[in-house]
Every structure is written in structure tokens, then in C-alpha cells.
């Protein structure tokens, strides 16, 4: 499920995990609304879209009950803002979210996807006798035409560590071109978190395994094993027991106000205190998204203050739920697992930490200049009287 354009070129395609969405469009009745010129669709984009036409990625997403049920609950929670309205599903995939919106009473749903899975979505819509309500458009969000404004935009745009694949830009494109003033965006807000972790089992499986293999000494393989296992970010599931400190907030996104250039580079500082004595094996990213109605929009300054590098405390005292708390989809280690898992940056050499030991530094996440869907990650941290730097590319 795919939304929009990225930098072109040949080379390493993004890992085919969950599908990325294709976008949709629309404007006011009559002349299509004016908007920014669409980015070109490159050969690289076409190969990327083709990779996600495979049924497996959609099966994985639909079998993620946390993800799918949270979206369905959020749609029904906002039924009063969806019933009788026009909805745009940016990157519809199999069309499940579009159909949920139709069940919630939407007058019309434009379901858009750039991958060939859109052809299957058409059949699914027809099978459910919703062709009079759900209009499937096969194309990029930047290229399709819809001759009316929309009241609601829904999209499952999140990639690994929230921002991988750069699909949020396509949601922004759709918002600026077609969303009516005061319209609804689901999800409405997102937060990206970072925390130091310990994971001895991972080192045992990937590195220390080579010390003795069937009675044969293979320690000479360990340096290569570390390079292969820990050079790039790793997507895997950890538990709350692996996390050494309360997380810090790397970025917060308000989908009502965020602009695409703000996503090009994000920098945040952190200052952690280890809650136990354990080896520091790396750092973990995870995210959550909220489903807020328009009346709960935050100011642009408040919503994006972390994009300016300000750190916020994400401890439980700052995450207490209020009576009117929004629906939240979380990928945190302590919550039910999802297909996003967590994104881990492992160190080549563990660092022994004492209880209450300090770890401070900064993290910078930037879109790759070669392939906009890739992320460059630079982690700088200071502990035990020494500075360290970990640089990785999420691709």
C-alpha cells in the first residue's frame, strides 16, 4: 500500500515488511484544487510499489490485531464525524480501512493505492457490495484526481520507527490539497521514543555462538558476526524488561499542522539514568499514534517542539490517561506486540552500566539524499567518561 514519491535511482530496496500506502486526491466540486506540483515517479518508486503488491505484506498487517482493531475502534469512536461525510484513504491496500469507514456511514470513500493491490481492493469492495460508496483509485496520491474536497483523511502511514519509508509526506500532500478546514485526520498525532536497552540473548545468538561450534574454535568469526548483525538497524521484538530507563521523546508530530520539510532532519537530546546494573547493548526506537478529533488539535509550536530538538520525559507520570484520553496505538516494548516490533541500534561492544549511571547525548534522524525512503541515524552518547558515536542507515 503506497502513497507517494521518493528519490529515484537503482539499488537497495526497502525491506518488504508491511505494505506502504498509495495516496489519493480530491478537490472542490468543479475545478480540481491547486496544490504543490507532485514529485516525479521514478523507476525506483515503481520497483518499490511492485514489491508491496505481494499478498504477504497485507496478510501480515491484517493479522496484526492490535493495529487493525485499533483503527476500527478509532473509526467507530469518530462515527459522528464520518457518517454522511467524504473520506480519503491514503494508501488503502486491501481497502479494509475504507470499508470500515463505509460501515461507519461514510457517504463516499476514495480509496487510493499506488501498488497493484488496488486491483484486489476493487474486487473486495465489489464482493462486499460497497461499490456505490467506496471508489478505488489505482495511482499515486500525487497523481490521482478527485473532483471534491474531503471531510476525513485516514491513513496507516507509519513505518518502522515511525518515519521509515517517508509516507507521511503523502498524507501531508493529501491534507493540503483536499482536506476541508476543520476536517478530521486519523491518526492525528504521533510520538517517537528512544531508550537504552540490554539484550544479552541477542549477543549470545549472533556473536558468542562463534566461540565454540561443535567443538571447533571459531572466535575469528566474531568481528565479522558483529558487523553483519549490528551494522544496520534491526527490527525485532523486545520486552519491557530489556529497557534500562524511562524513554525520551525524539519527535512529536501533529498531522493537522506538520509540514514536509520538518521531517527532513530531526534532532533531539536525551539524558538517561539507568534503573539497574546491566550491560548496555544498544538503543531502541518505538512509537505510538493517537486518534484525536479536530477539537483536540494542539498548537503547531506545542505539537512539533520535539522536532526542534527539545527532549520530553515519557515516564508514566507524564502518560497518565485522562477520562477523555484519545485512542492510542502503541508499539512500546511493554505493550502487546505489533508487526512494527521495535527498531534497535546495537553497539558493537556492550558497555557495563551501574545502577543510576548517566547516559546523555543526542540523536539525529534524516532522510537519505540518495533514497528519500531511507533514514540516516546518528547517535552520539556519553557515559563512563567517554563519548561514543553510532551511525546507521535504515534501508
UniProtKB/Swiss-Prot annotation:
Record-given protein name: Probable protein arginine N-methyltransferase 6.2
Active-site residue list: 156, 165
Pfam families for this protein: PrmA, PRMT_C
Function: Arginine methyltransferase that can both catalyze the formation of omega-N monomethylarginine (MMA) and asymmetrical dimethylarginine (aDMA).
Organism of this sequence: Oryza sativa subsp. japonica (Rice)
Sections of the chain in a coiled coil: none
Membrane-spanning residues: none
Keyword Phosphoprotein included in the entry's annotation: no
Domain of life: Eukaryota
E.C. code: 2.1.1.-
Stretch list, region Disordered: 1-37, 300-324
Family statement: Belongs to the class I-like SAM-binding methyltransferase superfamily. Protein arginine N-methyltransferase family. PRMT6 subfamily.
UniProt GO molecular function: histone methyltransferase activity; protein-arginine N-methyltransferase activity
InterPro entries referenced in this protein's UniProt entry, alphabetically: Arg_MeTrfase, PRMT_dom, SAM-dependent_MTases_sf
Alphabetical keyword list: Methyltransferase, S-adenosyl-L-methionine, Transferase
Biased amino acid composition, Polar residues: 302-317
Compositionally biased intervals (Gly residues): 1-11
GO biological process: chromatin remodeling; methylation; regulation of DNA-templated transcription
Domain SAM-dependent MTase PRMT-type stretches: 45-390
Annotated positions binding S-adenosyl-L-methionine: 58, 67, 91, 113, 142
Amino acid at each position: 500500500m503506497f502513497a507517494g514519491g521518493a528519490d529515484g535511482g537503482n539499488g537497495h530496496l526497502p525491506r518488504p515488511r508491511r505494505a506502504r500506502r498509495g495516496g489519493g486526491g480530491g478537490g472542490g466540486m468543479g475545478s480540481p484544487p491547486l496544490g504543490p506540483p507532485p514529485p516525479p515517479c521514478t523507476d525506483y518508486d515503481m520497483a518499490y510499489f511492485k514489491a508491496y503488491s505481494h499478498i504477504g505484506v497485507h496478510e501480515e498487517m491484517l493479522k496484526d490485531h492490535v493495529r487493525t482493531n485499533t483503527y476500527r475502534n478509532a473509526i467507530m469512536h469518530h462515527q459522528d464525524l464520518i457518517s454522511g461525510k467524504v473520506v480519503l484513504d491514503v494508501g488503502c491496500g486491501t481497502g479494509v480501512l475504507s470499508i470500515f469507514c463505509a460501515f461507519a456511514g461514510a457517504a463516499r470513500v476514495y480509496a487510493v493505492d499506488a501498488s497493484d493491490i488496488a486491483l484486489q481492493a476493487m474486487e473486495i469492495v465489489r464482493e462486499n457490495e460497497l461499490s456505490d460508496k467506496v471508489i478505488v483509485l489505482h495511482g499515486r496520491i500525487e497523481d490521482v484526481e478527485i473532483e471534491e474536497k474531503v471531510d476525513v483523511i485516514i491513513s496507516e502511514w507509519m513505518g518502522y520507527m515511525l518515519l521509515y519509508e517517508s509516507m507521511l509526506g503523502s498524507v501531508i500532500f493529501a491534507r493540503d490539497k483536499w482536506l476541508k478546514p476543520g476536517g478530521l485526520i486519523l491518526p492525528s498525532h504521533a510520538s517517537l521514543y528512544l531508550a537504552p536497552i540490554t539484550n544479552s540473548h541477542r549477543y549470545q545468538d549472533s556473536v558468542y555462538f562463534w566461540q565454540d561450534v561443535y567443538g571447533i574454535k571459531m572466535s575469528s568469526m566474531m568481528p565479522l558476526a558483529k558487523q553483519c548483525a549490528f551494522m544496520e538497524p534491526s527490527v525485532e521484538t523486545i520486552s519491557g524488561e530489556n529497557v534500562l530507563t524511562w524513554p525520551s521523546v525524539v519527535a512529536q508530530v501533529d498531522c493537522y499542522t506538520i509540514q514536509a520539510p520538518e521531517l527532513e532532519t530531526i534532532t533531539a537530546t536525551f539524558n538517561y539514568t539507568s534503573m539497574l546494573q546491566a550491560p548496555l547493548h544498544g538503543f531502541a526506537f518505538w512509537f505510538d499514534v493517537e486518534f484525536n478529533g479536530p477539537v483536540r488539535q494542539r498548537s503547531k509550536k506545542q505539537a512539533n517542539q520535539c522536532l526542534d530538538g527539545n527532549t520530553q520525559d515519557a515516564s508514566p507520570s507524564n502518560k497518565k490517561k485522562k477520562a477523555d484520553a484519545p485512542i492510542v496505538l502503541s508499539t512500546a516494548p511493554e505493550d502487546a506486540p505489533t508487526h512494527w516490533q521495535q527498531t534497535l541500534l546495537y553497539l558493537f561492544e556492550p558497555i557495563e552500566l551501574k545502577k543510576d549511571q548517566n547516559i546523555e547525548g543526542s540523536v539525529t534522524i534524516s532522510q537519505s539524499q540518495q533514497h528519500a525512503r531511507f533514514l540516516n541515524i546518528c547517535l552520539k552518547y556519553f557515559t563512563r567518561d567517554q563519548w561514543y558515536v553510532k551511525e546507521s542507515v535504515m534501508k
